[in-house]
Amino acid sequence: MTRVDLNADMGESFGPWKMGDDDSLLKIITSANIACGFHAGDPDVMAKTMALAAENGVGIGAHPGFPDLQGFGRRNMKVPHDSLRNLVRYQLGAALGMARAVGTQVRHLKLHGALANMCSVDQDMARACYQGALDVDPDIIIMVLAVTKQEQAVRELGCKWVGEIFADRAYNDDGTLVDRALPGAVIHDPDLAGPRMLKMVRAGAIITESGKHLETSVDTICLHGDGPTAVQIARSVRACLEEGGVSVTAFER
């Protein structure tokens, strides 16, 4: 039976300001990418989200991003590679410490927002970020945007990794994500997202906006926890996959 992981970005609330319905998502997904305080989140939110993930049997991932709370980590920043390594080391270190404190562990790491998008087209930048993570935990699983420079970087490093596709984002023909500023870049319709993911999993490929198939290993499917229909999309994707004979389960370390 085909198996695939279902992940979501979360832990992005800050103080009294709430973003996303993490409690509901954690009952549907199998992996959680938890913000590390730079683009979103705070220590209390991180601790609570990790504890809830562990309670629900959901695999925990560190989700480092640029230091940009106001821009939610979605604005490009020019950062030297040495600083990028330290940026990732710092955030992963915090995640590992918090996970241990609440009685669980971090299994994987996934870059956030603009940092991830920039690394999807710049292999040297991706390598710097991932080397920073491996310096802290050589056994960490790196979650990468499949078929992009991120995947090339982890293949070069020879580390553990899984390939990710998106349930709620449209694709360019090179495997990168369509710019959020463009119409149709973000998918909000659960009735579209679920069947679309089943089609890609069965094809073993990313299907771009032009209809091009980019063959890849579909190890995990992501949806953004901050979207207005995130919970509905998660339910739709999981239901469509399971009805289509796909087992939704966490990937193995």
Curated annotation (Swiss-Prot):
GO terms for biological process: carbohydrate metabolic process. One of its GO terms (molecular function) is 5-oxoprolinase (ATP-hydrolyzing) activity. Its EC number is 3.5.2.9. Disulfide bonds: none annotated. It catalyses: 5-oxo-L-proline + ATP + 2 H2O = L-glutamate + ADP + phosphate + H(+). SUPFAM superfamilies: Glycoside hydrolase/deacetylase (SSF88713). Keywords: ATP-binding, Hydrolase, Nucleotide-binding. InterPro entries: Glyco_hydro/deAcase_b/a-brl (IPR011330), LamB/YcsF/PxpA-like (IPR005501). It is an enzyme of class 3 (hydrolase). Transmembrane segments: none annotated. HAMAP family: PxpA. Forms a complex composed of PxpA, PxpB and PxpC. Belongs to the LamB/PxpA family. Catalyzes the cleavage of 5-oxoproline to form L-glutamate coupled to the hydrolysis of ATP to ADP and inorganic phosphate. This is 5-oxoprolinase subunit A. The lineage of its organism: Bacteria, Pseudomonadati, Pseudomonadota, Alphaproteobacteria, Rhodobacterales.
